[in-house]
């Protein structure tokens, strides 16, 4: 490996790709080793980072989506010679990229996922890359401490955004502040923003527009105060007597900030201990309340979900989404509606809390879950805000802190394990030395293993959810057989791997009479841009004289052209909008012409002179030779040719009515279908006659690549040559007259690369059986090389074959469908539709213990669903209430009836089955 030593001032143009890689690798290693609280990290778009990684590596593809460290990627071999990356462009990470925020507080898009959308770089690495490549905007974020011991470090990508409401002036302001700042700092900043005297100001936790608690513990952090993203903070200004004046109260009443018969007073804490949010305490001080001042009416501050039910059915209370917490809400609802847990946590379970268990959370997690369960089963339909529970969860599992989307199954696994340890009836776990089977009967060995397990693990979670499987290992050399019987909490079943993905592209033709069409093609998930272009070429029957230019459309502009055929398709997101333009094959001296439409954006009351022109619709693309002499009239003809497919019928054009409501306009929308589909309703245009609209009627502005204006000749016949730049942007001001002649409704929005929705009938016609998934899970297979077994007879590690069998099944069987797949080169989600039984899941033949006399039958009562892609999307739950035998959809705070036929879908993720009773086949 070549050693490189140079100052930070070195230009990247002086370095080879290998030297850049080594230089950044060494900086990254040093920075990661010395990271500490208070350091600054910087977000960089995953797309640019991926380009740079591939540029500086030489042997094979490299992808950063594997969770490994930054320095590891700088040691990953790459592939063929690639084009040097252009300027860093982080515009896809923020809402408004028109201006760079000099304070480095640009609003980052809320749904970003690390490793999918961005990479975090230490300050030293960011500074070096930016000095080489330039660009931005700069997105700096602080390192904070997290976890129970506050020793785990994390980058606070999304600081709290709080809405400050000033009473009585009814002013408001939004601020960003770290959750590690104190209430004192929040108080100071509120006074600074509203220009207030701090001695006469107090602030309230005003979550849900109710006074939840007075924030008077100035040294408490905002994290400890359980503040949530985008919640309200009430800022009260008091008079010299410490109260609001009558005039102020009247003003506040008019704005709904206080009740009509009240003044601003301290709200009394809840008198209920166990029913309040974190109100239990013991002589051991094992449970510390998070907030003392709790409003009695807090849980009644939200409107009903509107569910109409028979009688007074309980259990139909929703959970408010605190910001990407649907993953948590769906899992909680399934556990809460498990009958055994509902009964247990509504009774006095506190005597079973294990206060000394070092593997537990000293009872805090169990208490928080039990309190939440009681509220969800209480009478009424008012949605609950699970703030106290989320705070406890984040404290003991920092990976679930913040407001990023997480895996619902990972949350479920942690929660079940945490509840088990908090409720473990075994106070002192004995040491047990497990014996080998040594040829003994399976029944004897299985019972021995189970008794040993129960001697250390005995809780309601074990009683309800844990089963036992038989694991058989066979040495391939000496044939030594090792049999163990291990407990399981859930079964993670593999799904068939799909190596392709569907990508939808809108194709624009160079034929002046052809309308745009949407085409969906299947390509390899690990493919390159050239593979997508080839698939589109085949699908749209491209002529020999034509070529496709593929582009990503964003904010009514061509955000990027996919000119490099080696760009990985993984850089194309499912919610991107792609366009492909059919053009005549170009020579080296061809200039691309981008036609961008822009419309006057006049707001109410705005003066005519200040009205701005804003881009609209989808850009169009054409080409022209740099050597051709073009007149102003020819340029206008080029523009009219690009617009000709959207020309209205002559009768409509003559009327010039821009507000036409003909059916053709109303139906001119793209449909995301599985085959080529012409835009409905628009008539194919007749051959365009450029004389229909004189050149003087088109308002054009030409801009070159350097953002410099290209002056058009005043004389229409005077010839000009296009500059040698690769692209020229033509801005066309869209006028009412043009609207009367052309219908560009279909250009207003393009379909996304992949639209998620209910499973199609085609997908349902050939489903994957849940039994097939189970058989794949139980199938004998060799261990992977990284997990080789130590054979006691050979006294060496061997790649043994492993066979799993079910032996003991739990009362509640949780089945996880492994939709998310991870590898070093990629992450992806499997959209496979799995046909799972609802009423009679029969596992009898899969249980190796043949001494069981009863059939092993289960009935589905709950499941979680995931809609969307990796690291994003949305979770819901389908749950059957056993007391009324009806199915409901739990979508955060909204609950609605669903038919049993709608329970199955391609979104099903975690299934909850309950054992049927012996008599009658019904669940107990």
UniProtKB/Swiss-Prot annotation:
Identify which residues the record assigns to the active site: 326 (nucleophile), 874 (proton acceptor)
Q: Please write the reaction equations for the catalytic activity of this protein.
A: Thiol-dependent hydrolysis of ester, thioester, amide, peptide and isopeptide bonds formed by the C-terminal Gly of ubiquitin (a 76-residue protein attached to proteins as an intracellular targeting signal)
GO MF annotation list:
cysteine-type deubiquitinase activity
Q: Which UniProt keywords apply?
A: Hydrolase, Protease, Thiol protease, Ubl conjugation pathway
What family, per the record? Belongs to the peptidase C19 family.
Q: Which Pfam families match?
A: DUSP (PF06337), Ubiquitin_UBP8 (PF25242), UCH (PF00443)
Enzyme Commission code: 3.4.19.12
Q: Which residue numbers delimit the DUSP domain?
A: 15-145
Instruction: Point out the gene that encodes the protein.
Output: UBP5
Gene Ontology, cellular component aspect: nucleus
Q: What is this protein called?
A: Ubiquitin carboxyl-terminal hydrolase 5
Give the source lineage, highest ranks first. Eukaryota, Viridiplantae, Streptophyta, Embryophyta, Tracheophyta
> Which parts of the sequence are annotated with region: Disordered?
64-87, 648-690
Class of this enzyme:
hydrolase
Q: Does the keyword Repeat apply?
A: no
The job of this chain, per UniProt, is described as: Recognizes and hydrolyzes the peptide bond at the C-terminal Gly of ubiquitin. Involved in the processing of poly-ubiquitin precursors as well as that of ubiquitinated proteins.
PANTHER family assigned to the protein according to its UniProt record, in alphabetical order: UBIQUITIN CARBOXYL-TERMINAL HYDROLASE, UBIQUITIN CARBOXYL-TERMINAL HYDROLASE 5
Q: Which CDD domains match?
A: Peptidase_C19R
**Basic and acidic residues compositional bias: what residue ranges?**
648-667
Provide the effect of residue 326 to S: Loss of activity
Q: Where is the composition biased (Polar residues)?
A: 64-83
């Amino acid at each position: 490996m070549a050693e490189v030593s140079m100052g930070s001032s070195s230009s990247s143009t002086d370095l080879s790709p290998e030297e850049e890689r080594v230089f950044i690798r060494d900086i990254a290693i040093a920075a990661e080793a010395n990271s500490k609280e208070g350091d600054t990290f910087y977000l960089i778009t995953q797309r640019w980072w991926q380009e740079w990684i591939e540029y500086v590596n030489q042997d094979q593809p490299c992808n950063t989506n594997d969770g490994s460290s930054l320095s590891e990627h700088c040691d990953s071999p790459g592939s063929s010679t690639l084009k040097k990356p252009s300027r860093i462009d982080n515009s896809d990470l923020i809402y408004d990229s028109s201006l760079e925020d000099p304070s480095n507080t640009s609003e980052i898009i809320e749904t970003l996922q690390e490793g999918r959308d961005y990479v975090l770089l230490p300050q030293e690495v960011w500074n070096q890359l930016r000095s080489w490549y330039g660009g931005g905007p700069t997105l700096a974020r602080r390192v904070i401490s997290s976890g129970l011991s506050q020793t785990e470090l994390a980058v606070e990508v999304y600081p709290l955004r709080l809405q400050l409401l000033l009473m009585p002036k009814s002013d408001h302001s939004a601020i960003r502040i770290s959750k590690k700042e104190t209430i004192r700092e929040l108080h100071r900043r509120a006074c600074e923003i509203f220009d207030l005297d701090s001695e006469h100001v107090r602030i309230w936790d005003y979550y849900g527009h109710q006074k939840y608690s007075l924030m008077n513990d100035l040294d408490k952090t905002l994290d400890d105060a359980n503040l949530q993203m985008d919640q309200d903070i009430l800022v009260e200004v008091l008079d010299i007597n410490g109260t609001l004046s009558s005039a102020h109260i009247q003003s506040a009443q008019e704005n709904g900030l206080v009740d009509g018969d009240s003044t601003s007073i301290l709200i009394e804490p809840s008198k209920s201990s166990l029913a309040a949010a974190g109100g239990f305490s013991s002589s051991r001080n094992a449970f510390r309340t998070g907030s003392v001042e709790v409003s009695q009416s807090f849980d009644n501050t939200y409107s009903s979900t509107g569910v109409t039910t028979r009688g007074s059915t309980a259990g139909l209370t929703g959970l408010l989404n605190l910001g990407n917490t649907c993953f948590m809400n769906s899992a909680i609802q399934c556990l809460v509606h498990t009958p055994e847990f509902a009964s247990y946590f509504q009774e006095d379970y506190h005597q079973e809390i294990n206060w000394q268990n070092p593997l537990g959370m000293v009872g805090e997690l169990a208490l928080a879950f039990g309190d939440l369960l009681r509220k969800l089963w209480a009478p009424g339909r008012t949605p609950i805000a699970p703030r106290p529970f989320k705070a406890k969860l984040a404290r003991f599992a920092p990976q679930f802190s913040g407001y990023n989307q997480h895996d619902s199954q990972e949350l479920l696994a942690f929660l079940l394990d945490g509840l088990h340890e908090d409720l473990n009836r075994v106070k002192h776990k004995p040491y047990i030395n497990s014996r080998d089977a040594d040829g003994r009967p399976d029944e004897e060995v299985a019972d021995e293993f189970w008794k040993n397990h129960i001697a250390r693990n005995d809780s309601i979670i074990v009683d309800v959810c844990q089963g036992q499987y038989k694991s058989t290992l066979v040495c391939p050399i000496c044939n030594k057989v090792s049999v163990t019987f291990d407990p399981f909490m859930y079964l993670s079943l593999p799904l068939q791997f799909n190596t392709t993905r569907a990508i939808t592209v809108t194709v624009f033709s160079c034929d002046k009479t052809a309308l745009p069409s949407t085409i969906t093609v299947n390509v390899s998930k690990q493919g390159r841009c050239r593979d997508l272009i080839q698939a589109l070429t085949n699908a749209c029957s491209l002529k020999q004289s034509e070529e496709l230019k593929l582009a990503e459309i964003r904010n009514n502009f061509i955000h990027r052209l996919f000119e490099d055929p080696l760009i990985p398709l993984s850089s194309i997101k499912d919610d991107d909008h792609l366009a492909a333009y059919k053009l005549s094959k170009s020579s080296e001296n061809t200039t691309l012409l981008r036609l961008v439409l822009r419309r006057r954006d006049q707001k109410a009351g705005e003066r005519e002179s200040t009205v701005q022109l804003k881009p609209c619709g989808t850009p169009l693309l054409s080409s022209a030779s740099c050597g051709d002499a073009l007149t102003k009239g020819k340029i206008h003809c080029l523009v009219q040719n690009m617009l000709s497919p959207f020309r209205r019928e002559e009768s409509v054009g003559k009327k010039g009515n821009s507000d036409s409501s003909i059916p053709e306009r109303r139906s001119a929308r793209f449909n995301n279908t599985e085959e080529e589909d012409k835009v409905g309703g628009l008539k194919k245009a007749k051959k365009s006659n450029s004389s229909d609209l004189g050149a003087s009627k088109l308002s054009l502005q030409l801009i070159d690549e350097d953002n410099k204006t290209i002056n058009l000749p005043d004389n229409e016949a005077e010839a000009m040559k296009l500059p040698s730049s690769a692209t020229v942007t033509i801005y066309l001001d869209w006028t009412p007259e043009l609207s009367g002649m052309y219908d560009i409704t279909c250009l207003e929005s393009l379909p996304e690369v992949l639209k998620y929705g209910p499973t199609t009938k085609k997908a349902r016609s050939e489903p994957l059986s849940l039994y097939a998934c189970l058989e794949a899970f139980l199938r004998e297979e060799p261990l992977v090389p990284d997990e080789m077994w130590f054979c006691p007879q050979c006294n060496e590690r061997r790649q043994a074959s492993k066979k799993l069998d079910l032996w003991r099944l739990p009362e509640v069987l949780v089945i996880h469908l492994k939709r998310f797949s991870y590898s070093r080169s990629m992450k992806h989600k499997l959209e496979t539709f799995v046909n799972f039984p609802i009423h009679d899941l029969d596992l009898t033949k899969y249980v190796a213990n043949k001494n069981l006399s009863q059939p092993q039958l289960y009935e589905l009562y709950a499941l979680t669903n995931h809609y969307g892609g990796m690291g994003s999307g949305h979770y819901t739950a389908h749950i059957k209430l056993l007391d009324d035998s009806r199915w409901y959809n739990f979508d955060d705070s909204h609950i609605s009836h669903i038919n049993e036929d709608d329970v199955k879908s391609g979104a099903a993720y975690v299934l909850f089955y309950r054992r049927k009773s012996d008599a009658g086949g019904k669940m107990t």
